[in-house]
Amino acid sequence: MAHANAESHAGSHHYTSTGLDNRKLAIWIFIGSECMLFASLISTYLIYKGKSVVGPFPHEAWTNPQTGQAFPAILDIPVTSISTFVLLMSSLAMVMALAAIESRGKPSGAKSKLGNYLLTSSRFWLFMTCLMGATFLGFQAYEFTSFVHEGLSIRTNLFGSSFFTLTGFHGAHVTAGVIWLGTLLAIDMKRGLQPKDAVWVDIAALYWHFDDVVWIAIFTLVYLIQ
């Protein structure tokens, strides 16, 4: 009887023959497919890079042929660097949120109330992750609006088409991540996420870290390399 209960308990974790939880395997397969998607989008951007006939251009100043008005290079690297830093810090907050849930019910070892709170408050860290993700999206919305105001849209030239498609897809993924983490935050506030729920937070964390890694590639290839 005890043996049967043990088998039932082990089976409830849904492990594959490799010892990996089915839910984690599913997210890794999904991330693999997303890698191929972004690889194709980045490749398309690189193929068309520098082939736009008319401006605006990413790294070169240009003059509007109709008005004669001169414009600087359209990419604002300092502003985007700030948004990139915010997104990277959100990954740290996500790590802290997962650690807080996994250690729930265990002594934190912190000597102060503040230290104990920061080590055990998954709600705080989930909120900070969502906030920083939303801040990144706010920066992206500002950037898109500025580009359109300066004459760059998805139909303007090859750069505009490939840029808006690539960064727009990434922004959509970040939006989905913020909604996902916001849902986990709501659940945590309602009933409290326990160590047994950590796998779901871990899956969300894998997705969030993937979004960050993709953005590092985009930021490097689009903004930094001229």
Could you describe each region identified by the protein language model?
Residues 1-226:
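...captures the hydrophobic TM-helix bundle architecture rather than a specific catalytic motif
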